[in-house]
A protein has these predicted regions:
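A compositional/biophysical signature of low hydrophobicity enriched in polar/charged and small residues
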Residues: 1-78
């Protein structure tokens, strides 16, 4: 499994709704609310060889009230 993170900017007042939709979809490993330019930080795992760009485009960015995303690819956990 390959881990990666997505920072999500939501439409105003919609952060909790987006977090709940992500949780209901059962595609995220962990979901955190954050301060700063983005509202949520979400950890995902995909199978080796999965196209992360397509996953984010088709599974994450299609959730209503998501305004913007930033994907963070990680190399190694310590």
């Amino acid at each position: 499994m390959v881990p990666f993170f997505v920072q999500i900017k939501c439409h105003l007042g919609k952060s909790y709704e987006v977090a709940n939709k992500l949780a209901d979809a059962e595609i995220a490993s962990e979901i955190y609310s954050t301060a700063g330019d983005f509202d949520l930080l979400v950890k995902f795992y995909v199978e080796d060889g999965t196209d992360i760009g397509h996953f984010v485009n088709e599974k994450v960015q299609t959730i209503p009230d998501i305004q913007d995303t930033r994907t963070i690819i990680t190399f190694k956990a310590f």
